[in-house]
Amino acid sequence: MKFNESWLREWVDPKVSTAQLCDQITMLGLEVDSVEPISGEFSGVVVAEVVECTQHPDADKLRVTKVNVGAERLLSIVCGAANCRQGLKVACAIEGAILPGNFKIKKTKLRGQLSEGMLCSFSELGIKEDQSSGIIELPADAPIGVDIREYLNLNDVAIEVSLTPNRADCLSIAGIAREVAVINQMEVKSPVIKPVPATLSAPIEIDIQAPSACPHYLARIIKNVNVNATSPLWLQEKLRRCGILSIDPIVDITNLSLLELGQPMHAFDAEKVKAPIQVRLAKDQEQLVLLDGTTAKLQTNTLVIADQKNVLALAGIMGGEASKVNAETKDIILEAAFFAPLALTGRTRQYGLHTDASHRFERGVDPTLARQAMERATTLIIEICGGEVAEVCEAINTEYLPKQPIIRLRRTKLDSVIGHYIEDRLVTDILVRLGLNVTCENDGWIATVPSWRFDLEIEEDLIEEIARIYGYNRIPNNALLAHLTLKGSAEKVLEPNRIKTVLVDNDYQEVVTYSFVDPKIQQLLHPQQEALILPNPISSEMSAMRVSLLTGLLQTVLYNQNRQQNRIRIFEQGLRFIPDASAESAVRQEAVFAAVIVGEKHIANWEGKSKAVDFFDLKGDLEQILALTANKELTFVAKQFPALHPGQSAAIMLNEQEVGFIGTLHPSIGQKLGIKGTPIVFELLADVVSERAIPVAKEISKFPANNRDIAIVIDEHIPAREVLSACYHAGREQLTAVNLFDVYQGANLVVGKKSLAISLTIQNTEKTLTEEEISAVIQLVLDELAQRFQASLRD
């Protein structure tokens, strides 16, 4: 919101400097982004009148003028502006004047003619937003000889504030003035708005077909309007200083309503509207050429203003080219309405638009403003353009107008939240000055919210308002009033951050990928898994909810490889979305951990090149995570997956249930995706690693450990993990460690057999074991293996 200080001070004029005023506005929560002077630094420029204007004898584009600056004689000034003419009141820089850029005005000759000053344009005075190429044209009653800075009030600044979306009430001079008046305990001096009596009868039928989107619509015909009149300088200057160019009186007045009151308005050429006026949703295949010349193909969720035949405007957004007011317009229809924020939210983005009107309607406009704005605009139109006024025609559905909430504020709640006692009298005063209708109770207040405050709904909103107006800087820094009790955490909980730390310590980097993925890539990886398809996706490449984190991780690998990053180790914790009719919203959300590695195992160094990562590198990293958990029954079972290499993949099992997978990406899929190298991936349900093994104190033996190696022959299909588990079971507490250090298949072994070389560590906490006792433990192990797996010692 951009406005000029002098306009604000017409409404409320606190005895503070510009800097103090800006500080007040910022402390009110309306952050001041910039404060800029209206004009450049200059002096010696006065109001003057062109008494004579003749053609320069030696230059076609120059004129020789006699100018009255209020001095004893007329000044001779040469001017090149096309709009220079006899009788015009102008801004004249006299001899000795200093213009912006330290440009000094001196007597000189131009093509042989004496020039004793300069007739100035806005840009030459450092006034921005001026597109005219001519000199300034002042009103005919401008007093000659008066300093132009004083006459135009150029000792003014433009203030721009950044508003949060909830403070739409401050998108106007009236709204800012209300806030400044509250903090300075002053009254707002708003312009007196009186109803304009009708001088003719010209009723307009209004048909509101979408009352929930537009519960209130007003229209008025004004006939015999002089659209070609010139907007008065005060109106042009108010708009200019707010960053809006003057176009014509009708548009300027509707823009004034928007800036002054916060009520967007629009004017139609009455001859181009065939009553009744309809407020409805767009029909299929309808189009509208907008004021900016673009053609909008209307969607059926768009609210429009229409007549019997055509769409006239996008309601609350932009008017149409066909019904706009132009130089030939004689009669106009003036419109003011309330459009519900939800009816307009997102519509501007559908058409690539953003207008001052839509910016306000999307956030909320005071529903009581339309009538005031209509009368204010009518008064100005009659004053500037003349015309005959018809009655105001109105259609209203009070059922759909915003309700004014009634909020109960408790004294105990106020003290608890703020942590500082504010007197009842002061609390009441603040609420009343904010425009609330307040009733005091023994233990609090009952407050009715004003129509312009859409952001006040609950008790905490009122507390925030009280603290804001009272002043956050006046609230002391006290200790918290709440009694806080530290809540203990279960020792068995394995925090996700602990798992992430293990991965980071192993040189992984955490990534966060979109939950929306390319359905084609996901189908390639998980052809048997149905996915949830979004009805309104961001793009076709992000139209499916992920059923695995694998899709996003592999796309991240490709993204990095395309940027010359060949050694990649990444992981992600996130949700996957599995369609399930029995789940809430028919989607089962599962938290998972996933990772992928590709490239070299280590960065190459002076010891030599590093080898590429393989299946067992990732399996080892995963086993470090599993070692933290209480689930010691987690196992790896060979299994084929569509996305993985058939000979290098496994399911992660817990109590005969599949809880994850690990493996090498299928070469054909890697080729289709354009991924270089051989990525290895895993995905694991987060619930499986949510509990950690609680540490148990064990006695450390002071007696020597005894290592013995055995080599057994078993069927090749028997997993080594089952053999190791059987060893532990047989050796009991005296077998402290079992390690597989070699696997052999080939010569000297029967086909279908394999040899496992296992190291056994035997130790007792109470004594040194004898050879006989050691041999007894080994024999127990061999007997167990022979019984369960028909294992035999290798010769």
From Swiss-Prot:
CDD domains: PheRS_beta_core (cd00769), tRNA_bind_bactPheRS (cd02796). Keywords: Aminoacyl-tRNA synthetase, ATP-binding, Cytoplasm, Ligase, Magnesium, Metal-binding, Nucleotide-binding, Protein biosynthesis, RNA-binding, tRNA-binding. Residues 701-794 form the FDX-ACB domain. Its cofactor is Mg(2+). Residues 39-149 form the tRNA-binding domain. GO terms for molecular function: ATP binding; magnesium ion binding; phenylalanine-tRNA ligase activity; tRNA binding. GO terms for biological process: phenylalanyl-tRNA aminoacylation. Binds 2 magnesium ions per tetramer. Tetramer of two alpha and two beta subunits. Belongs to the phenylalanyl-tRNA synthetase beta subunit family. Type 1 subfamily. This is Phenylalanine--tRNA ligase beta subunit. It comes from Haemophilus ducreyi (strain 35000HP / ATCC 700724).
